[in-house]
């Protein structure tokens, strides 16, 4: 089956979505119950379910995140095939300073799941780009704004700030009065990146 809409240049040949209802956030009890089902499907001992959230939410060990992402995507029952977002939250007083948060969506089941990975300031987290290609620029943004390194990322470099920018602007200890304007000297130091993929 091929579908071409006025919004797409390339025909879509995949299966039609099985659930065409709009996403409606569920109650806490339903989210917790669904989280129990997902946790049983995954069976990772280092995964902790966070209850009382607006969607099924889990804290995952950084060493298991790639396996959890793969299982959520490849499971025929769960089918979390779309990464909606990846972002970080900075807790400077905590030993594991950053929460790196993944939000995934299942077109098949019309539901969302949230995964949190806690990492320290000098720790790296494995990249998820081998599972979801769409995580590429999300990971670059988290690296640029917070300094979280994604091991194995195919092109981990700044995406929102220039190469001469020092620091990471969304960290809570970043001085907002500090400005890193791009000067002619900085421009001379920057190596232009010509990426044939774009």
What is the meaning of each model-derived region?
Residues 1-198:
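Terminal low-complexity/charged segments
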């Amino acid at each position: 089956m091929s579908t071409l809409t006025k919004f797409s240049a390339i025909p879509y040949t995949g299966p039609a979505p099985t659930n065409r209802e709009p996403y409606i956030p569920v109650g806490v009890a339903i989210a917790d119950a669904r989280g129990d089902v997902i946790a049983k499907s995954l069976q990772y001992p280092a995964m902790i379910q966070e209850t009382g959230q607006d969607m099924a939410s889990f804290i995952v060990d950084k060493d298991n995140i790639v396996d959890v992402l793969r299982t959520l995507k490849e499971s025929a029952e769960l089918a979390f095939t779309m990464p909606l977002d990846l972002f970080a939250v900075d807790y400077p007083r905590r030993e594991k300073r950053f929460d790196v948060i993944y939000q995934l969506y299942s077109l098949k089941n019309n539901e969302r799941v949230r995964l949190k990975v806690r990492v320290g300031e000098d720790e790296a987290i494995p990249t998820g780009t081998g599972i979801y290609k769409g995580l590429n620029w999300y990971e670059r943004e988290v690296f640029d704004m917070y300094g979280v390194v994604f091991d194995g990322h195919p092109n981990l470099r700044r995406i929102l700030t220039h190469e001469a920018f020092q620091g990471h602007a969304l960290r809570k200890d970043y001085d907002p009065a500090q400005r890193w304007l791009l000067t002619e000297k900085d421009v001379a130091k920057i190596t232009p990146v010509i990426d044939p993929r774009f």
